[in-house]
Amino acid sequence: MLSISQLPSFSLTTAKSLRYPSSPSSSLSIFFSFFPKVSNFVRASSGIPNLVACSPTEIIIPRVNNAGLRIEEIVDAAKGKIRLDSWISSRINGVSRARVQSSIRLGLVTVNGRVVDKVSHNVKSGDEVNCTISELQPLKAEAEDIPLDIVYEDKHVLVVNKPAHMVVHPAPGNPTGTLVNGILHHCSLPCVDYSNSEEDDDSDEETFSDDEEMTTSPSSYAASVRPGIVHRLDKGTTGLLVVAKDEHSHAHLAEQFKLHTIERVYVSLTTGVPSPPQGRIEIPIGRDSSNRIRMAAIPGGVRGGRARHAASRYKVIETFAGGGSALVEWRLETGRTHQIRAHAKYMGVPLLGDEVYGGTKSMALSLLQKRVSRSDQEEIIELISRMDRPCLHAIVLGFTHPCTGEIVKFSCPPPSDLAEIVGLLRRSGL
């Protein structure tokens, strides 16, 4: 079984990385075998260009825009009346509630043939709703001097270790302090206007969205300029992201994500232990009809149009506290929003610290507090009480370099909050 016994010995002040050629060996075992010996970035002798400072390069990426999308439906509200914006949001995947509200206020929605511009208007069963989705409003992303943990950089790509609580790109609720703002400063790019994506909650997605608009051909790219964000991580998720620094690299990496040839490995702490301890879960994922900020695993949802195909492979690395928690490795075959979190919840083992998907602090404490040694109970209470995010970390990222054609792979250790809990659970030895 894969061991990560070296985890507590990691230096957690600055994330380091190990880069190594692809091999059939487990990427995690290689990482944990070599990482304690690595003090700086390691480059294999494989012809990758020397590390260079980022030049002020303009990078064109596609807009995400569902403008003009229309629905004409009769309301079927089983529970009586429902807010107009809530009902429309539940009927359209990939469009944020804020975007729906903007469409209503602009007079693009009618109920029974009459324009309604009040988002809180109630509709009932039998009402006929006509809605046209409005244009995305451009956001201005300004360069900000935000410290970035650069794992690797050359003329074409940038690999970043994203910290917890950093949003990947600006959105209506997060206009500043994002990874994009920091990259604009790092690459000496000017502030830019661009259309925001539809992810207006805490998700940049766990990972890349396989939606068609994310892999639009270069000829249809909009004229706005911003760093080439190819995939995303949730606000609370830490770990590795690759950013394209030119149009060719963006298109090449986007195609790899579309073909699912990118290697993405995550580690998480779960509440409880997955059963069986190793396997593959293939359950479609779609928007949770009862909670707009949450996704849900929906068996059969693809046939009904409510969900999209999603598949994850998992393996229990280590169990703690008599089955109260487990360190789990995840490998993604698809890249749906909140995929790991939704699949873990469906399996009955939500991620520790994931309040949205059921891995609450109270649940974690009920499972762990009495199962650790008495001397460690006070510390486990403190550590879990401080955990304000899902215990999920993107630990390995591998892809084909868009310019050299070489398979490259990067790793970075989990951050201190996750490492401290794992260290305590392992030390407790129950």
Curated annotation (Swiss-Prot):
It is an enzyme of class 5 (isomerase). PROSITE patterns: PSI_RLU, S4. It catalyses: a uridine in RNA = a pseudouridine in RNA. InterPro entries: PsdUridine_synth_cat_dom_sf, PsdUridine_synth_RluA-like_CS, PsdUridine_synth_RluC/D, PsdUridine_synth_RsuA/RluA, RluA_PseudoU_synthase, S4_RNA-bd, S4_RNA-bd_sf. It is found in: Plastid, Chloroplast. Its EC number is 5.4.99.-. Residues 195-222 are annotated as: Disordered. The active site is at 234. Its main location: plastid. Residues 1-43 form a transit peptide. GO terms for molecular function: pseudouridine synthase activity; RNA binding. GO terms for biological process: pseudouridine synthesis. One of its GO terms (cellular component) is chloroplast. Keywords: Chloroplast, Isomerase, Plastid, RNA-binding, Transit peptide. Residues 82-155 form the S4 RNA-binding domain. NCBIfam families: rluA_subfam. Belongs to the pseudouridine synthase RluA family. This is RNA pseudouridine synthase 2, chloroplastic.
